[in-house]
Amino acid sequence: MARIIDLVPWDDGSTHVYASPAILLPMERQRNQLAGVKQQLYHPALPTLRHMDRDTVKACLPDEHCQSTTYCRKDEFDNAHFTLLGVPNKPLQCLDITATGQKLRNRYHEGKLAPIAPGINRVDWPCFTRAIEDWSHFVSSAGEFKLPCLRKRAEGLSGYAVRYLKPDVTQTWRYCLSQNPSLDRYGQKPLPFDSLNTFRSFGSSYSRVNYLTPWH
């Protein structure tokens, strides 16, 4: 921005400088060569593809093209808050042992760490070697449900909820049985090509089929 300055003549023939107030004219922004002001990877005003395409269509000269010039100054690049060059002054604590970790390590070597809280027995802790037995007992004790009687003519299976785990564990229904053919608001949906052969073919020896895997 610039201010208009007028030279006002006086009666004695001298000339005094008079600045007219509140009259500002916009000045054209100065373009700087990108290589002269930028020494980092960070670009405060990164040119977009649209700007570069526009300058290419306008056949702008190199000193006018946004790919080689910028309105940013050198101090704006120097004071950038992000850069991928150089080593940070203060490295992250996660890259090395923290101060708390060093204290605990020293106390551990000195034998000053507190023992296990009273009431907790190591025998009661979960043992990974008994995981298979625990899982087998858990699955065998899981509840089962029966499907309704199939003697009725209009019997559908859509919407019946099934689960892998007991309700005490999952608290939600994860899977639902779907019926083929099924209906939507437009009518009957197309029948899949493998619906009638679901229980006739046993799949390939190189892949496991979902219906051969028990869900209970």
Swiss-Prot record:
Tissue specificity annotation: Expressed in testis, prostate and placenta.
Gene Ontology biological process terms in this record: flagellated sperm motility
Lineage top rank: taxon: Eukaryota
The protein, known as: Sperm microtubule inner protein 8
UniProt-listed Pfam families: SPMIP8
Places the protein is found: Cytoplasm, Cytoskeleton, Flagellum axoneme
InterPro entries: SPMIP8 (IPR034584)
Physiological role: Microtubule inner protein (MIP) part of the dynein-decorated doublet microtubules (DMTs) in flagellum axoneme. May serve to reinforce and thus stabilize the microtubule structure in the sperm flagella.
Signal peptide: none
Alphabetically ordered keywords of this record: Cell projection, Cilium, Cytoplasm, Cytoskeleton, Flagellum
Subunit architecture: Microtubule inner protein component of sperm flagellar doublet microtubules.
GO CC terms of this entry: axonemal A tubule inner sheath; sperm flagellum
Gene: SPMIP8
